């Protein structure tokens, strides 16, 4: 591999002696914080700017950017950032190399050569670029409709992710290709369906007693609590369980390693569920009161239901076999779900009598369509303030100064009903027919029994005794006095990359719930809630006063016919179907694309996606770099790096941190901030962003000021409920949205406070909401709108009803999914979590003869974030080539040695990667690296064809609900790359001239990528 020759110290030394200070750009925007500070310093004095790192797209690590004379010279960890503990990983430190890279895009460009060839980029002005975009979009829209223009976005740098989303409204298109479809999206999709949006996020930062790390290596990179935090959490846990097909870095330290076959996560989750149920390790009160486990299933009647709200606010019809009052009584409510009360006779003797004898009901009429008792049980007594009674949480290993949070005591039923979880009961329907009904729990119990440890062992390859031991360790409370479980499950990206993505995530959500780990300390809590909601800042996510497309536009979304639940979800179109539509024109032509940080290599078969990109009439790409994808663009626009921009920021997950990404230095030359570009497009298209006369297209200063105005010392509006004998009353409290006094009048004031205070704890900012656990009990789970939790300052929108429960059709965590049942009536097996074998896996007897090895992929690499950083010299020097991990015994069978280039092949494509012999993968499994390309290759596409793993996948192997690509657990064959079987007689990939890629750490081309400080004016 050669010797490492370029150290971080070498670069810092170079940075100190090279070039002049970067010049200012864009007088209309906030100046870089460091520049303002320089008025009082001189010479070699430096400023440390607190900010939020975006070296990867996941973790909100607090860092300091060290700026000297207008130039950023290094990034270091912020020890005061409680969520990241001063962590500063290799990607973060290398951000300086990205910001000052000689290959950064500085100016708008247009292509001059045909697509599929080297683009022949020509510099143009911003005015020419933007006018060309408007003209082409309007022409295509006039010919084919807004749906002929698609939007694409990558992962969560929020300023591009949500700027792109508003473009859907602007262009009136339902079609957006999202990395979200294969990255966190299936988790968010599934949890929205069965509990609450993004309840997959786990509060690892409060250090659970049992830490379950499922399908990821967050000790290396990514996810809300990663790197140093993950190591600390795992080290302090009483029990650490790692579930992974390969031995991850922290896996070797785990108490239990569940070494499963790739793609069998769902079977293992159901096996754990079986153990939990059979050993009665579940939280009985939670299961009975806050899930639909006691609701009764009637399989001898036609499903019926009621209209309820989609994620976008439109309506759809629930059709369910769950027994309702309307099924047993003419004129009865379809919202009242019946349960059998084991205590009915005792209560009757005490003078509490149910309307239907042994059966009582829960009313899920959350919008008060029929009566006011929605959200409550028959005859219930409930008081919001009593629901909050409890104590401060008592997690053992919090960092000094970290807020514990308020833990309400579990609230028993009042009156003391006892909903049955088991049994079979007779009831007479309104047509006079007597039927037998069973609780959902009976069906769930039977489903889990299909995957008891002995069965799951055959599927997963893990011994049954080890499955039972790990599940028991997770479910058995180490300290029962806490009143909650040992912790949630940090299930990560791997579980989403199969045709069972949604079912996998539903299985985890239910498992967390029944063990008493939903919204509890160290449990799964969902996205952090704070008033600024940095993940959804106003200027990049929504446009107050702007118009939204009519509902019929959303009904045109590509892929909705193949995946009906996309019509319920509505946050992405199916990427596979979109690329097909570009090529075939079916179901209608898609002729243009707007892309902000999206990457065609992340999902679908890459070869098919490339064909589609080359077929577009017009394509605009916003980026920092020349990339494989934008080699097919017609116009590319240069954008700012994270150290060159301002953005509010809160933890996307459960870490509970609030801060900011702060502009440290000016962007180079003519690079602009994504929201400014989108706003300019809106102005040129006469699409009004606000309804404020004279400020229809506000500048970035106004938008930033607007983004923090709900941060206040006032208590925001909330509602308390008092229910007596089933009769509810409510009272509003706090200050209405439009009347709050902002704590900081301007963005600059907020940033100044952030520099002085550091990261705030959301538990302190919103004590009734994020600062309180068991929000399903207090009503705070429904305090904000049903998906994003967005607050609309001007209209007071986004405020929920504060009723206890969840935002599901039944207002319960749904073990039996009414959403799935309603959209897939012909698949009764999908109503409960289930397991499906991966297509093209080892159970495919015909294929395994030719393709004997199971491929997995997607692991975290310390120096890269998916496709990013391949041109950063520190990173590429440390990890110059893609590696395929092969068990040494397997490698010996194929005559492969450490460092050999290896061909990996399926019937859909073949690639080359370098052998890395590792006993941490099983003998019949190989582990491939993903999204590789070679910036040094100047041919169109920058050599993505050489090693990009998704060339190997079946384009049409998808999850039947979300459309997610089956990216892992498929069969491949391997053989050593030799001069005889390689182009140019070279096992190392070469460009069209025969020049090899950079494949050693001492390649002199790496030095050509060292930072430059010239040409930024």
UniProtKB/Swiss-Prot annotation:
Cofactors named for this entry: [4Fe-4S] cluster; Mo-bis(molybdopterin guanine dinucleotide)
Record-linked InterPro entries: Asp_de-COase-like_dom_sf (IPR009010), MopB_CT_Acetylene-hydratase (IPR037949), MoPterin_dinucl-bd_dom (IPR006657), Mopterin_OxRdtase (IPR006656), Mopterin_OxRdtase_4Fe-4S_dom (IPR006963), Prok_Mopterin_Oxidored (IPR050612), TAT_signal (IPR006311)
SUPFAM superfamilies attached to this UniProt entry: ADC-like (SSF50692), Formate dehydrogenase/DMSO reductase, domains 1-3 (SSF53706)
Note: E.lenta strain ATCC 25559 / DSM 2243 is not able to dehydroxylate dopamine, likely due to the presence of a serine residue in position 506 in this protein, instead of an arginine residue in dopamine metabolizing strains.
Domain of life: Bacteria
EC number of the protein: 1.-.-.-
UniProt enzyme class: oxidoreductase
Similarity field: Belongs to the prokaryotic molybdopterin-containing oxidoreductase family.
GO molecular function annotation: 4 iron, 4 sulfur cluster binding; acetylene hydratase activity; metal ion binding; molybdopterin cofactor binding; oxidoreductase activity
Domain 4Fe-4S Mo/W bis-MGD-type: 45-103
Inducers of expression: Up-regulated in response to dopamine.
Keyword Oxidoreductase tagged: yes
Protein name, UniProt field: Uncharacterized oxidoreductase Elen_0471
Signal peptide coordinates: 1-34
Modification comment: Predicted to be exported by the Tat system. The position of the signal peptide cleavage has not been experimentally proven.
PROSITE patterns (alphabetical): 4FE4S_MOW_BIS_MGD, TAT
Residues the entry annotates as binding [4Fe-4S] cluster: 53, 56, 61, 89
Cofactor annotation remark: Binds 1 [4Fe-4S] cluster. Binds 1 molybdenum-bis(molybdopterin guanine dinucleotide) (Mo-bis-MGD) cofactor per subunit.
Keyword field: 4Fe-4S, Iron, Iron-sulfur, Metal-binding, Molybdenum, Oxidoreductase, Signal
Gene3D superfamilies: 2.40.40.20, 3.40.50.740, ADC-like domains (2.20.25.90), Dimethylsulfoxide Reductase, domain 2 (3.40.228.10)
Catalytic residues, chain numbering: 91 (electron donor/acceptor)
């Amino acid at each position: 591999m050669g010797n490492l020759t370029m150290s971080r110290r070498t670069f810092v030394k170079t940075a100190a002696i090279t070039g002049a200070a970067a010049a200012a750009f864009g007088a209309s925007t906030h100046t870089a914080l460091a520049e303002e500070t320089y008025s009082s310093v001189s010479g070699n004095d430096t400023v440390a700017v607190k900010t939020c790192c975006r070296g990867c797209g996941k973790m909100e690590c607090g860092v300091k950017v060290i700026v000297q004379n207008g130039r950023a010279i290094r990034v270091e960890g912020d020890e005061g950032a409680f969520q990241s503990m001063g962590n500063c990983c290799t990607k973060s430190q290398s951000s300086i190399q990205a910001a000052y890279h000689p290959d950064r895009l500085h100016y708008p460009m247009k292509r001059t050569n045909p697509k599929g060839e080297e683009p022949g980029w020509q510099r143009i002005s911003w005015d020419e670029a933007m006018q060309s975009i408007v003209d082409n979009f309007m022409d295509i829209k006039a010919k084919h409709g807004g749906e002929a223009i698609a939007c694409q976005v990558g992962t969560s740098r929020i300023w591009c992710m949500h700027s792109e989303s508003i473009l859907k409204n602007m262009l009136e298109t339902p079609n957006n290709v999202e990395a979200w479809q294969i990255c966190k999206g299936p988790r968010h999709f599934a949890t929205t369906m069965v509990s609450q949006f993004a309840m997959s996020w786990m509060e690892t930062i409060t250090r659970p007693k049992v830490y379950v790390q499922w399908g990821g290596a967050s000790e290396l990179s990514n996810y809300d609590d990663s790197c140093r935090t993950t190591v600390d959490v795992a080290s302090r846990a009483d029990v650490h369980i790692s579930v992974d097909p390969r031995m991850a870095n922290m896996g070797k330290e785990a108490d239990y390693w569940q070494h499963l076959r790739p793609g069998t996560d769902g079977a293992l989750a159901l096996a754990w569920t079986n153990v939990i149920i059979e050993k009665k390790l579940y939280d009985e009160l939670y299961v009975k009161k806050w899930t639909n486990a006691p609701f009764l299933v009637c399989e001898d009647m036609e499903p019926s239901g009621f209209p309820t709200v989609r994620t976008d606010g439109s309506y759809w019809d629930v059709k369910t076999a769950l027994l309702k009052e309307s099924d047993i009584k003419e004129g009865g409510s379809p919202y009242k779900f019946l349960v059998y009360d084991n205590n009915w006779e005792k209560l009757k003797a005490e003078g509490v009598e149910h309307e239907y004898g042994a059966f009582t009901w829960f009313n899920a009429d959350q919008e008060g369509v029929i009566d006011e008792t929605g959200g409550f049980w028959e005859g219930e007594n409930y008081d919001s303030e009593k629901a909050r009674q409890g104590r401060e949480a008592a997690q053992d290993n919090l960092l000094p100064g970290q807020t514990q949070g308020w833990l309400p005591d579990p609230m028993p039923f009042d009156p003391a009903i006892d909903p049955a979880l088991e049994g079979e009961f007779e009831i007479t329907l309104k047509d006079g027919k007597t039927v037998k009904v069973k609780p959902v729990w009976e069906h769930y119990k039977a489903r889990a029994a299909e995957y008891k440890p002995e069965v799951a062992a055959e599927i997963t390859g893990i011994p049954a005794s080890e499955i039972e031991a790990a599940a028991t360790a997770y479910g058995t409370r180490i300290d029962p006095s806490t009143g909650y479980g040992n912790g949630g499950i940090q299930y990560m990206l791997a579980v989403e990359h199969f045709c069972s993505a949604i079912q996998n995530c539903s299985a985890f959500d239910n498992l967390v719930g029944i063990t008493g780990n939903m919204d509890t300390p160290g449990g799964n809590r969902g996205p952090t809630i704070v008033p600024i909601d940095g993940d959804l800042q106003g200027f990049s996510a929504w446009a107050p006063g702007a118009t939204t497309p009519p509902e019929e536009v959303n009904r045109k979304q590509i892929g909705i016919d193949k995946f009906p639940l996309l019509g319920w979800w509505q946050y992405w179109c199916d990427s596979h179907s979109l690329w097909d539509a570009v090529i075939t024109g079916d179901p209608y032509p898609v002729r243009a694309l707007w892309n902000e940080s999206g990457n065609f290599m992340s999902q679908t078969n890459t070869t098919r996606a490339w064909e589609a990109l080359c077929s577009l009439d017009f394509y605009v790409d916003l980026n920092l770099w020349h990339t494989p994808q934008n080699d097919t663009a017609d116009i590319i626009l240069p954008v700012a790096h994270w150290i060159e921009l301002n953005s509010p920021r809160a933890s996307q997950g459960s870490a509970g941190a609030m801060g900011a990404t702060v502009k440290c230095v000016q962007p180079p030359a003519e690079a602009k901030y994504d929201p400014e570009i989108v706003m300019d497009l809106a102005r040129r298209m006469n699409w009004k962003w606000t309804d404020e006369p004279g400020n229809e297209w506000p500048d970035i200063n106004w938008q930033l000021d607007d983004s923090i105005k709900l941060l206040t010392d006032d208590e925001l509006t909330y509602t308390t409920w008092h229910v007596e004998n089933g009769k509810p009353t409510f009272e509003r409290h706090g200050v209405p949205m439009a009347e709050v006094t902002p704590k900081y009048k301007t963005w600059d004031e907020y940033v100044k406070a952030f520099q002085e205070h550091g990261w705030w704890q959301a538990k302190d900012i919103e004590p009734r909401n994020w600062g309180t656990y068991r929000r399903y009990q207090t009503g705070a789970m429904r305090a904000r709108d049903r998906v994003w939790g967005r607050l609309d300052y001007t209209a007071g929108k986004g405020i929920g009803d504060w009723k206890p429960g969840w935002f599901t059709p039944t207002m319960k965590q749904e073990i039996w999914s009414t959403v799935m049942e309603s959209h897939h009536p012909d698949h009764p097996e999908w109503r409960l979590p289930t397991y499906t074998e991966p297509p093209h896996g080892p159970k495919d007897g015909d294929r395994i003869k030719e393709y004997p090895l199971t491929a997995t992929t997607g692991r975290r690499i310390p120096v890269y974030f998916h496709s990013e950083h391949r041109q950063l010299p520190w990173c590429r020097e440390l990890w110059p080539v893609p590696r395929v991990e092969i068990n040494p015994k397997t490698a010996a069978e194929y005559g492969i040695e450490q460092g050999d280039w290896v061909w990996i092949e399926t019937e859909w494509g073949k690639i080359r990667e370098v052998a890395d012999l590792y006993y941490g993968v099983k003998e019949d499994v190989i582990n491939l690296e993903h999204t590789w390309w070679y910036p040094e290759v100047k041919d169109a596409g920058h050599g993505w064809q050489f090693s990009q793993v998704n060339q190997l996948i079946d384009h049409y192997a998808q999850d039947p609900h979300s459309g997610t690509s089956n990216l892992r657990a498929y069969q491949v064959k391997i053989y050593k790359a030799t001069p005889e079987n390689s182009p140019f007689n070279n096992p190392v990939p070469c460009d069209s001239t025969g020049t090899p890629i950079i494949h050693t750490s001492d390649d002199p081309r790496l030095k050509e990528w060292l930072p430059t400080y010239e040409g930024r004016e």
